[in-house]
Amino acid sequence: MRDVADVANVSVSAVSLVVRNKAGVADETRQRVWDAISKLGYSVSDAQEEVRSPGVGLLIERGSMPAMLDIFYGEVVRGFQSEAQRLGYQVHLHMFDRHAETSSALRTKLASEANGIVVANDGDITPEMIMQLEELNVPLVLAESYVAGRRLPCVLGDNFTAGYSVMEHLLAAGHRSIAILQGPRKYSSLNDRLKGCLAAAASAGLLIPPHFMPSPHSENPRKGYVQMKELLEADQRPTAVVAISDKTAFGAMEAIKEAGLRIPDDIAIVSIDDVSESAYTNPPLTSFHIPRSEIGVLAMQKLHRLISGETEVPVKSLVYGELIVRESSAQKLY
């Protein structure tokens, strides 16, 4: 109903919300839409029959899909999708495969089907690609990613604080021999978590040696298991480990038990994400809770305001989390 949107001087998505009697539109805007429908000679039933839900694109790298569906990003997506449906949008999920698709083809596809785009996570979706998406002049919001030096609206978990908090927790328990199972550097969220860990260690005068920070094995689905095995095979064994994500921690815990060691008596372990499985590991995993569903909801709300033509100052929004202490780090050293 582009003609109604033009007469009412609103977005097509606003017309859709009004006709479908959805929330998210101011009373004054709602009245303008109905006035335009009347002026153009449409009946209510005509308008409801003709209007189609506006589309929003959700873009994520294909490599993230197993983790997205099983652990972390499933909740981000569910939050985004439920809020999109509440606001009257149809979600077009697009998984970018860098081996099978060019960034040019991606831009063409998204421009044809979406009134706005949310990019969830980064990784293979590089800063250069995001800047190219900006050139489409379509509302764009980032979730759990950002581009340094670009004032793009984004919604993030408080990843630096998460890293700082889990490391500080181990330091407060008396640990000084602490390893970090880091993640791939192409993810800004994981980089911020690592920076937080190192900042907390530096504040305590602790330097993490390189051999206590094994590199991730990007192509191996059991990254945490492989990294922990590498640590356990070294001459010196840490008394505690920070895993950069719960998925990494699950693999690390398996390797520790396989080596005949006890958690936390021989090695304490903490992590970041606090997915539902974390409370049911043996022992239950200490983890910093990232409000994943809320990130998706807030990203969609921000995108809706942009699509609706509202003035939106581009800000980097951080969603607060909290440390959930469980038995995996319970032992104190004296």
Segments from the language model and where they lie:
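Flexible loop/turn connectors
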Residues: Y225-Y334
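Short beta-strand segments enriched in small/hydrophobic residues
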Residues: A14-S16, E50-M68, S177-P184
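N-terminal helix-turn-helix DNA-binding module of bacterial transcription factors
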Residues: M1-R52, L333
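Alpha-helical recognition/docking segments in bacterial nutrient-uptake
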Residues: S53-E168, A172, L231-E233, K247
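Hinge/beta->alpha junction and helix N-cap segments in small-molecule ligand-binding domains
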Residues: E28, R62-E75, L93-T102, G123, ...
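Short acidic/polar active-site loop segments enriched in Thr and Asp
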Residues: S11, S43, N115, R176-I178, ...
